[in-house]
Amino acid sequence: MNPVEFHPFEMQFEVPGTDGQTVYTRRFQAPRRLIILGCGYVAQSLCRFASQLEFDIYAADDRPSFANPYTMTNAKKVICDSFPAAIEQIHPDEQDFVAIVTRGHKHDADCIRTLYASGITPAYMGLIGSKRRVAGLFENLCTEGIDRSFLDQIHTPIGLDIGAITTDEIAISILSELILCRSRLSLWKKNGILEQTNLDPVFLNALQTKEEKAIAVVVERKGSTPVKTGAIMCVNALGQSFGTIGGGCGEHEVLRKALEVLSDKKDTFLSVDMTNDFAGEEGMVCGGTMDVIIRYVPGKVEI
């Protein structure tokens, strides 16, 4: 399947329950951008790890020996320029994650000033540095007129406290905090919207084709199952599947039911008993159940 440009879109699902139907909307989005300001050794490790966990990496530094495709090998874009100029080129928005890991607080201050001046508050901002030095930096920025409420949204010291010492360990501690924040942002909201940002591009491409398809979503699980609630799979009329709900006999049963949905052109609900099932190719024995909603999506006719 040829890659296509991905445009965010939403899809509604109705989940049967004891008190009637629960309707929620899933918003399919491209992976979140992680903007790494600074391309030193911690940043290089962070870039390497984060790119494997569905972040699109944008990196910047003013040193050519650090800001290049050879040091930030997995970055989608690397900018060698002053930090204020780089931030203006990247255009951070409310969905972005920003990790400020420059080589000194002079550059940290430049980054924070530029972010504040943009009028945009990213979904996540983190700053590397000791509590004492960061406190002094924030005090100086406050005297310049930067709102304290903006500074209070910056995670500092950046990363979860896992006792990190080495460069890779520090990067992992930062990534752990990024994952935690991303997961919290993707939880159910009061308006019933569940964000989906970390899907396989092949699946997203399949979802956007004009052909009819069936979308299977795990909406409830009990016991030991190979995937979490929210796992999703797309099936076309040829029986090709994209994405996974865990493999094994359970997925095969859902695939068979999805073909029936395509034939009947009607949504359905399926409870899959996975007792003694083997998940995927790993030989993992499952002993739980999964409730799966399968929605019919008609094809689009070009006029």
Please provide the spans of the model-predicted regions:
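ADP-ribose/adenylate-binding Rossmann-like module
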Residues: 60, 97-108, 113-140
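Adenosine-phosphate binding glycine-rich loop
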Residues: 128-200
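Conserved SAM-binding strand-loop segment of SAM-dependent methyltransferases
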Residues: 76-82
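Short, conserved SAM-binding/catalytic segment
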Residues: 70-76, 144
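Short amphipathic alpha-helix with an adjacent loop that forms part of the alpha/beta core around
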Residues: 83-93
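Short phosphate-binding/catalytic loops that engage adenosine nucleotides
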Residues: 55, 120, 146
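Short, charged/polar "capping" segments at the starts of alpha-helices
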Residues: 65-69, 133-136
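Segments forming oxygen-rich coordination pockets for charged ligands
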Residues: 1-62, 69-71, 96, 140, ...
